[in-house]
């Protein structure tokens, strides 16, 4: 049986604020993913998108604003987060499901995204198999996950915030890249973010540097940042 590390008997640490400032922050966070979709997807024939792990639904809002004609769907394991997403993004078809064994066939998608989800899975290869199965040939898969090879992990060691009880599949950027390409994908972009895993870099004035790179670059083609960011194309 498929197993995930989310404990729904405890308060969810992933319920996000409705404040205007937080919504702006989230929009900036997802701007890079929107940019990658526009760059690598066949936007003239871009009709459907699936998000694995909708969280609180902020990415769905960003997509609706950028791609108003695209059919949006989502899967969320935690019913509490799913309820929030359905209220925040009623235009999207979001269901409860497990990233390792969902079955939405005969539906297929032009773009599938998953942000900070795969590290919660005991069997990430199962999710990659589902992504490959549900993605149209030539479709784009965008994934982010904590980077075990990042400077934050190396400097903070056991205090690194990526080390959590529910992060059961942590890997370095190169290891993630190899795993995904071995499951039927080719690399379009492979890199990582900046230094958000180092507390000092999140405080003023250094925090402004982090925000500058987030807003204007999103991610870089290097392997030492906080989160791995990968854009892959189904062969």
Residue ranges and their predicted role:
Residues 1-107, 111, 115, 125-128, ...:
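Conserved N-terminal segment of class I S-adenosyl-L-methionine
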Residues 6-32, 36, 100, 122-131, ...:
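S-adenosyl-L-methionine-dependent methyltransferase catalytic module, highlighting the catalytic core
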Residues 116-120:
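A short His-aromatic
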Residues 69, 91, 138, 184-187:
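A generic structural signal for alpha->beta connector loops
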């Amino acid at each position: 049986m498929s197993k995930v590390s989310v404990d729904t008997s405890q308060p969810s640490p992933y319920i996000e604020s409705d404040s205007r400032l937080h919504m702006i922050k989230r929009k900036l966070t997802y701007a890079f993913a929107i940019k990658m979709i526009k760059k690598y997807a066949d936007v003239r024939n871009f009709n459907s998108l699936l998000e694995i792990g909708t969280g609180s639904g902020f990415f769905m809002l960003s997509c609706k604003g950028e791609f108003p004609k695209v059919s949006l769907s989502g899967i969320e394991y935690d019913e509490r987060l799913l309820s929030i997403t359905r209220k925040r993004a009623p235009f999207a078809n979001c269901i409860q499901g497990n990233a390792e064994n969902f079955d939405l066939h005969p539906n297929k998608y032009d773009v599938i995204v998953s942000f900070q989800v795969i590290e919660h899975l005991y069997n990430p290869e199962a999710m990659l198999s589902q992504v490959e199965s549900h993605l149209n040939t030539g479709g784009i898969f965008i994934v982010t996950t904590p980077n075990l090879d990042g400077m934050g992990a190396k400097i903070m060691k056991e205090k690194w915030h990526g080390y959590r009880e529910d992060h059961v599949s942590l890997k370095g950027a190169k290891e993630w890249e190899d795993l995904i390409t071995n499951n039927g994908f080719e690399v379009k972009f492979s890199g990582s973010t900046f230094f958000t895993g180092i507390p000092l870099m999140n405080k003023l004035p250094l925090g402004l540097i982090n925000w500058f790179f987030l807003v204007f670059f999103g991610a870089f083609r290097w392997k030492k940042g906080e989160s791995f960011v990968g854009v892959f194309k189904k062969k």
